[in-house]
């Protein structure tokens, strides 16, 4: 298991420390006893079934209908549980999300077998727990610009005949439908098949007749498979839960002959 906790805060952050003894550092919240990578951002509540616009949490002290009235395209209200919401992140409130990029457990499993001249070795890696911010997926779910590619999940978007969905309606010239929020946080758990090697060593008595000391044929496969919470997502990009334009480990298959005289 992996444990991570802050034991003290830097002195130069004293002016930023709030009532609960922590401070914001980009998309993270730093506090004593918390993880170095606890996410801090907007909380996505879903889609307004009446309009198709997104809903983001706003703190009660920041909720001001008098200030909201007259703002173009802005919707606001209160959920049945008392939570206040707005449709634009410019008026929403960032908050501690209770999710960390730090995994609960990570490791690997490997094994090797030999029988009747055959040898097989397998190496795997895994992670359980933690969250990753899937920025690729977010960019494919509505950038607010023309000529952009879309993820197939956009077909689940709100329409007048599909009002029970978590995907807002499509809009141009707005980032609110894909703004940074916990909507794009997804579990970073994964299982990867890192290597499989299969070989066969010919019997010595066969090789003696050919005046060869040893002969082995083998096939090697690297990075053959990755299972994650969303197809195409590689949570291994960074330990901080961020994603970038990086290549995943390439899948390769090769073979060879080991010959000894």
Predicted regions and their residues:
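Extracytoplasmic gating/loop element in the C-terminal half of outer-membrane beta-barrel translocons
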Residues: 127-222
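Extracytoplasmic loops and strand-loop junctions of Gram-negative outer membrane beta-barrel proteins
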Residues: 24, 88-96, 148-151, 176-184, ...
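C-terminal beta-signal and terminal closure region of outer-membrane beta-barrel proteins
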Residues: 20-53, 154-155, 159-163, 178-180, ...
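Outer-envelope beta-barrel architecture signal
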Residues: 105-107, 116-118, 189, 211-215, ...
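Short sequence motifs at beta-strands and strand-loop junctions characteristic
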Residues: 99-104, 183-192, 247-251
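Transmembrane beta-barrel strand/turn architecture of Gram-negative outer membrane proteins
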Residues: 1-43, 104-142, 196, 200-202, ...
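Membrane-embedded beta-strand positions of outer-membrane beta-barrel proteins
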Residues: 122, 217-219, 257
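Conserved small-residue
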Residues: 1-99
């Amino acid at each position: 298991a992996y444990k991570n906790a802050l034991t003290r805060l830097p002195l130069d952050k004293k002016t930023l420390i709030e009532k609960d003894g922590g401070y914001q550092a980009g998309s993270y919240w730093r506090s004593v006893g918390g993880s170095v990578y606890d996410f801090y951002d907007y909380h996505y509540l879903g889609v307004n079934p009446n309009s198709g616009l997104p809903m983001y949490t706003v703190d009660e002290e920041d909720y001001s209908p008098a200030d909201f009235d007259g703002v173009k395209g802005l919707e606001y209200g209160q959920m049945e549980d008392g939570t206040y919401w707005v449709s634009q992140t410019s008026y929403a409130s960032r908050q501690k999300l209770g999710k960390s990029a730090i995994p609960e457990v990570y490791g690997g499993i490997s094994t090797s077998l030999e029988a009747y001249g055959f040898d097989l070795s397998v190496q795997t890696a895994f992670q359980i727990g933690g969250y990753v911010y899937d920025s690729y997926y977010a960019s494919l779910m509505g950038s607010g610009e023309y000529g952009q590619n879309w993820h197939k999940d956009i077909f689940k978007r709100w329409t007048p005949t599909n009002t029970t969905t978590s995907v807002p309606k499509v809009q141009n010239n707005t980032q609110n439908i894909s703004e940074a929020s916990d909507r794009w946080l997804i579990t970073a758990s994964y299982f990867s098949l890192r290597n499989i090697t299969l070989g066969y060593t010919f019997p010595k008595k066969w090789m003696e007749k050919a005046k060869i000391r040893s002969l082995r044929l083998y096939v090697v496969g690297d990075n053959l498979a990755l299972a994650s919470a969303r197809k195409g997502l590689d949570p291994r990009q960074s330990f901080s839960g961020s994603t970038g334009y990086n290549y995943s480990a390439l899948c390769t298959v090769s073979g060879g002959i080991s010959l000894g005289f």
